[in-house]
Amino acid sequence: MIASYLGTVFGSASAPAFARSPGRALRPALALAALALLAGCASAPKTVPLDTSITAQGQNSRVRYIMLHYTAGDTARSLKVLSQGQVSSHYLITDDRVPKAYRLVDETRNAWHAGDGSWYGQSWLNTSSIGIEIVNMGPIGTQWQPYSDAQVSLLIRLIREIAARHDVKPQHIIGHSDASPQRKTDPGPAFPWQKLAQAGIGRWYDVNTVAQFSASLAQTGLPDVLWFQRELARVGYAVPQHGQLDRATINVLAAFQMHYRPARYDGQPDIETAAILSALE
């Protein structure tokens, strides 16, 4: 192709000089100019050359939260939904005997896992969180599927690494239901938050402090609903502040109880829930 192009520009070597038109005398110069232009384009860098030898101190990670979910489906279905649909997560932990951790979205990019929710007043949590899905069916009738010890062990390792990379605070390691208590229940009451806390991951309470608050509340009586609403907001939850035990407040109380008192999560104010709220920092 190049040879035929040059032949067209320069003409045939056997053609007599008197047969050429005057305009043909310019063609060699034009061809050389075209070749020079092509050479220049070929050598131009495809991206802007950057000097990365200096790094600014004034920066931090975009990641502030780690959010945990259950998939409500098996591994094959979960992988398909999370990789081919309009929902995704950064990581997926399987339920194999020896669980596997898939990275589906790079931590530098947003995964679509959080949806509508809020934590400590911040919404649009997809932009500031790492999402981890765990293969688990969630509720099965009136029961909840437990998480295997192997899953939890792998999850602890994964969260520890992510939290260290991004300096994620303990109170910002949450469940989907913590950020979206009006519409979500995952990772559910079967999720072992206390076991994670014993491994140094997430926020938990001191049992002796809870016992002291419980004894005090037994004497003074149960606080009113507005007290519960204010305390729930203090520890991160989006909850109404009108002093009424409405459905929205019940849902937030139930989400809190699933996380910190999973033995009973009826969404009703009680002394133990009040004591745990008081003990949390």
Regions found by a protein language model. Give the residues of each.
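Active-site-adjacent loop/helix surface patches within enzyme catalytic domains
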Residues: 44-59, 64-169
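Second-shell loop/turn segments in exported
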Residues: 79, 118-119, 138-150, 180-183, ...
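Bacterial N-terminal signal peptides that target proteins for export
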Residues: 2-30
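Acidic/histidine-rich, metal-coordinating catalytic segments
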Residues: 168-183
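Structured segments of extracytoplasmic/periplasmic soluble domains
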Residues: 82, 94, 107, 135, ...
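Short acidic, glycine/serine/threonine-rich helix-capping segments at coil-helix boundaries
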Residues: 216-280
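Acidic, His- and aromatic-enriched active-site or binding-groove loops in soluble protein domains
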Residues: 58, 92, 189-212
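C-terminal motif of bacterial Sec signal peptides marking the signal peptidase cleavage site
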Residues: 39-40
